[in-house]
Amino acid sequence: GWIEASSRYSFNKSHAVSYAICAYWSAYAKAHFPLEFYCNYLKYSGGKPDPQREVKELVTDAKSNDIFIHPPSLEYLNEETSVINGKVYFGLKNIKSLGANTIISIKENVKDARSLLASEIWCWYDFLILISRKINKTASRALISSGVLSELKTSRQKMLYEFDTFEKLSNKEVEWAEENYKNFNSLVDLLRSLARPRKEGGGVTNKNRLGIVNDLAQQLENPPVSLQDDPEWIVRTEENYYGVALTYSKVDSVDVSRGNTTCKDILNGKKGNLSIVVTVNEARKYTPIKGKNAGKDMGFLEVEDATGSMDGVTLFYDAWYKYKNMLYNGNNILIIGKTSGGKRDGIIVDEIFEL
């Protein structure tokens, strides 16, 4: 009988104790071993009910503690999220379009290519010639677009443009490029030399290909579009591959000079009249049922900037109805307001400007 009676309360108590212990050790790890804390929580986020939301919240929270999560490293080719030389790196498995066999192929081809390099220092030109055609197109584009190759100090747009150009060469022309690439410092120089008949030391087999390769070289020298990376494009691309932006925040694509504070400053207790440039993550409507504002809609915002996120942004009735149409997810706005009385990390909104 006592076992049955005990079951009415022991289950809840045991869970309460378990959660308390987990919360204590998690807080201890976050305070004393922050890199390992974020690394392991990110690594096992797949077991959460909403993994993508969990990852985004962890990356944003880490940012507010001056810990930045990086794309996987070409140098180490870590498969899992890892702490390497005092930094947290996502793993290749975190890139959505890369399967297990593709990752094996990437690692094997990078290892083979390293043995051919004159030094241990990689450049984009080395990767393009020695590796890009040996793994599938999707994998090459993913490595470029997701930032794995960013340590090669070439813009992602330029890498994608040169990769697409190199893909247009025939297999014979690629063989010539692999045999002769050490004689050149760039793809355009290689193509200029390639665009000669074989009897003159070039790599084309007919006049038609001669014209095509020359045109490719000309397009590399005078690209039709800018090959500089746009922060907004990088944000969208990284969200596509990881579910969260790592290199930039959405506010990096707009002028933030009109702001006088950041999310991190406010979370750390900054007071007074404030202006802050943020991205809207979520807007929630709330209708009080009691008090002097009963029945009048108001709103609460979760916002984010390059330093972190906060959710204590309040719009009372007049402000909510005046600005609610610009409070959609992903929109960059300038908030003018003041810190709320009792909340250490809250803002009462006076004005909002769309950027």
Please place each PLM-identified region on the residue numbering:
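Noncatalytic, beta-rich nucleic-acid-contacting surfaces in large DNA/RNA-processing enzymes
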Residues: 1-355
